[in-house]
Amino acid sequence: MVSMEVASRSGGAMTQLLRRSGPNAIRSTTVLSNNTRRNFSSARPLPPTYEKLYTKYTDVRRVLGKQRLTLAEKILYSHLDNPEDSLLNNTDNGRNIRGKANLRLKPDRVNMQDASAQMAILQFMSCNLAKPAIPASIHCDHLIVGSKGAEDDLSAGIQTNKEVFDFLESAARKYGMDFWPPGAGIIHQTVLENYALPGLMMLGTDSHSPNAGGLSTITIGVGGADAVEALVGAPWELKAPKILGVQLVGKLSNWASPKDVILRLAGHLTVRGGTGSIIEYFGEGVESLSATGMATICNMGAEVGATTSIFPYTKASARYLDSTRRSQANKNIEALEAFASNSSDPDARWQFKADEGAEYDELITIDLSTLEPHINGPFTPDLATPLSKFKEVVKEQDWPQVLSAGLIGSCTNSSYEDMTRVESLLKDAKKAGLKPAADFYITPGSEQIRATLERDGTLQTFQEAGGIVLSNACGPCIGQWKRQDGVEKGTSNAILTSYNRNFRGRNDGNPDTMNFLASPEIVTAMAFAGSTTFNPVTDSIKTPDGKDFMFSPPHGLEGPQTPFESGNAELGVLSQAPDPNTKIAISPTSERLAFLEPFAPFPSSDLSGLRVLVKVTGKCTTDTISAAGPWLKYKGHLPNISTNTLNTAINKETGEVNAAYDLDGSKHTIPELGQLWKERGQEWLVVAEHNYGEGSAREHAALQPRYLGARVVLTKSFARIHETNLKKQGVVPLTFENEADYDKIAAGDEVATVGLYEMLQNGGKGDVQLRVTKASGEEILIPTKHAVTKDQAGFILAGSALNLLSKGI
C-alpha cells in the first residue's frame, strides 16, 4: 500500500488519502457443494425479498467459491438473472470479474421522477403490457418552479403542468404503479423514507438515485429505456463495476458534516474518477454517521461518475428504519443474518457489510476527525476548496464577494439532522438580533420532513429568520427557479447552495451565476454575512448594536424524538392495483406530450455519407446536450424538446456558444442545423472531448440527437449513463484510440464507418474505424474504441432498445 499525503488546495487540513490498486477480491475458485442451498420450509421463515436474495446468494457462492466479496458485490451479484452465466463468461473462470463481466441483473423495483417518467411511460406503453413485471413508482418533483413560497409555487405548478400530471397519474392507475403527487416530495428523499431497504437493488431514472445507498441499497441511475427493460421483466445489463473503497476513520466534529466527506472526495477523484466503479464506504468512522448523512454522501457519488455508492447497515440505519415506521425491516434483517449464520459453510453466511479480507481496486482513507468544511465550485462539483482557504481563493480568482442568495435543502441535504443543525445557527443569530444578509431559501425534501419540522417548531424558526420555505420539490436545484431579486441574465453573481450539482447556468438559466456547493450549515452562516469571504469558524459579524457575533458550531438531532409526521394526507401516495379500464389520452395538438415513432433500424451495411454537425470543446454535460429548467415542460414531446439540443455547447473551431455552420457556410444554432439536416435526410455525428454526457441520467440527451439524425458520437471519453443511453437509442458511441486524432477531424467533414456493421453483426466483437474525407478531398483513417456488448449490438441493429422490447424480444 502506498500512502499519499495530499496537500493541494483541495487537500484541506491534511486529510490523509491512502490509495491502493490491486487485483479483484479473488482467492479461489473452489466450487462449493450443493449443500449450501437452504431448505426454507424447514427453517425460520424469511420474508420473500430476503429469501430470494439469500437463495441467489448461495448460487453466487457456488460459482465463486471462497472469494471474499464486498457488500456491493454481494447485493449486486445476488440480483443476477443467472449467476453462472454472468460470472463465468468473459472472465477467467470466475476470476477478474470486475470491469470485464457483463452482468444481467433483475432489479427489485424502478423509481421514476416526473420529468423522465414521461418518456419512460411512453416507451412502456409501446410494449403493450397490462402491468410492469416489478413494482414501480412515479414521483412528481421536477416540474414545480420555486419562487415566492410553497403554497403559491405548488398551486401554480399544478395548474401549469396539469396535462402532464394527469397523464402520469392515469398511467400509474392503468399499470398499478405508485403515484406520488406534486408536493409529496423529491424522489430520492421519498424513496429513502419508503422504499429503500438493505439488500435491495433498484433502478431510478435520475442520476442521484444512489442516494438510497445510505440504507445499504444498490440503486443505479438510468435512462428511461433502461427502466423499461426492467419494467417488462427483461434482464438489465451492466458491465461489472470495479469497487472503490473509502475507509472512514475518526469522527466528525464542529463544523464538519457528511456533505464535506463527498465534497472532499470529489476534489480528489474529479468528475471522472469514479467512472465504472461502485464506491463502498466502510471503517469505524461509518458508525458515527446518521443514515441520512450516509445518503447525502451516496447522493453525490454521481458527481464523480460512480455507478452507485453504498454504506453498510449500521445502528443508525436501524434507528432510521424505526423512525420511518419500518421496524419490521430490522426484524427481517436480523432473521436473514441469523438464518445465514446457521450455514455449515462460513462462506454462505450473510452480513450487510463486506467480507473480512475483501479487497478493493482502489482504497482511499479519510480521517473524519481532521476533515474541515469544503466549498466546491463554481461550474463544476470537483473544484474543492477547504473553508480555511476559500476567502483567499475568492480574492485570487476575482469571484464575486457579495453573496446574492443562500439555498439549503434539496434531495441532498434536507434531512431532519441537516435542518436541526441549521436551526441551532438560526437561534444563535436570533439572540444577536441578526437576519440573513442574502436571500435565504429552504427546500424540504418531502412532506414527511416538512410536516415533522413544522410539528417540532423548526419551520417556524426558519420563517422567523426571514427564510422562504419552498415546496417539497426540486425547484432551483434542477433549474426551476424564478428569482425575485432582480439578478438578470448576464449579471455575474454568487450563490451558495447545499445542492449536488453546479454546472454553468443550471440553477437560474444565467451562465454568469456562480453556484458554490457546501453543507447547509456553511450556506446558512455565510448567508447571514452576505459574503463569500466569510468564514464562520474564525470570523465575526457586527450585530445591530455594534458587537461582534460569532456562530457556535452547529448541533442537531439525528432524527425526531418521536416518529416522523406523515403530513398532509392529500400529498400521500396513491397505490393501487392495475386498472386496465383507465384511458390514457394524449391530444394530437399537445405541446407537452406526443406518442413516439419508432426509429429506423440500422442499415445492412456500414454507415456512409455522415457529416460532422459540430465539433465541441470543453465540458459537455447532459445539461449542455439537453437543458433542464424551462425545457422540462417538453420532456414528453420529443420534437419540441429537440429544439434545445446542444444549445450551450461551445464550438471548438469558432469559440462560439450554440453555433454551427452548414456546408454552404451559413450560420445556424446547433439545433437549427440539426433540424435542417434531418429534413434533408443528412445523417450526422458529433465530435467532443472528455466525459461527454457528464451529469444526469437524462435520456433526452441521447433521444434528441437520434431524433435529429445523429448516428455516431465520437469523443475522448464518455460518462457511463450517457454512453448506455446512446446505445439504447441506436446511436453508436465511439472513442478515439489516439486522443490526438481529435485535432484531425472538423465540422463538415464527411465520415464513413469501417467495420461497424460487421462488429454489430458479431455481437460487439471487432474493431471500428472512421474514414474521414476532408473538404480538400484528403482521406484519413481514424481508429476508434467501443464498449458495445452483445445485447447492445442488438439494440443498435434494431434501431433502438424499444424496437426490440416492444416485440417481446
Spans of model-derived segments:
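Fe-S-dependent hydro-lyases/dehydratases of central metabolism
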Residues: 41-809
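N-terminal mitochondrial targeting presequence
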Residues: 1-47
